[in-house]
Amino acid sequence: MTSKSWIRWLGAPLIALVLTIAPPVHAVEDARKVSVVSFGLFGDQGVFRSEATGAAQVVAGRFGSGPIDVQYNSKKGGGATIEALAKSLQVAANGLDTENDILFLILTSHGSPAGLAVKAGRLTQTLTPSNLADMLARTGVRHKVVIISACYSGVFIPLLANPDLLVITAADANHPSFGCEDKAKWTYFGDAFFNIALRQARSLKDAFVVARALVKKRELREHFEPSNPLMAGGANVEPLLIVRP
């Protein structure tokens, strides 16, 4: 189904209420820098490579005024490991004004109640909520956005979300998400949030509201139990990202 078909199918009233055709979104007028780090962690399926790359491009196009770091794994190997993620976050942080700029992290993979699966060739790891919370704290960057596209990704919210850290997840802590086919370009959530809603919405919140409705509609049509995407925290972060007049 194309993006236009998705929007027609969801229905005009909700789209008219939430989604507007907008000029590019940028940081506020004081030239706030937004640095994007995007990791496709599970190498056995190409959808995570595609989604990590595509999501970073969309976010940078809507918000970007800083560097982009995209890493992913394949069946043969790759550098998107837990250690590499910690290093990439620190490198990104070193180029930011820690009080004023924004660190934007995107993670896409399979997930479980324990965390996110990392698979690079024969290497297997689990990125836990406590692992990620520690990494983010060590960056010293105040304002952060974390978007996690994975099953059970809501498990990350309790340890991550706070007024300075906005967290968006593809599912709650008790449900899988869908669309992890090897040759797909996007997961269901990635398609709805990054590929459709965020390209047009005026804010992350608006994009999330539309994406959540799109995902639920698709899941019900395909007889899946809804994954219940979540958004939490970020009261001090989201206002810093606005549409430039």
Where are these regions (language model features)?
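Bacterial N-terminal signal peptides
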Residues: 10-21
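Boundary/activation segment at the start of structured domains
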Residues: 23-100, 179, 184-187, 242-245
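Extracytoplasmic/secreted cell-surface and envelope-processing proteins
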Residues: 45-49, 78-82, 113-119, 154-158, ...
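Active-site microenvironments of hydrolase-like enzyme catalytic domains
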Residues: 92-121, 144, 150-176
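Active-site-proximal C-terminal subdomain of hydrolase catalytic domains
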Residues: 150-238
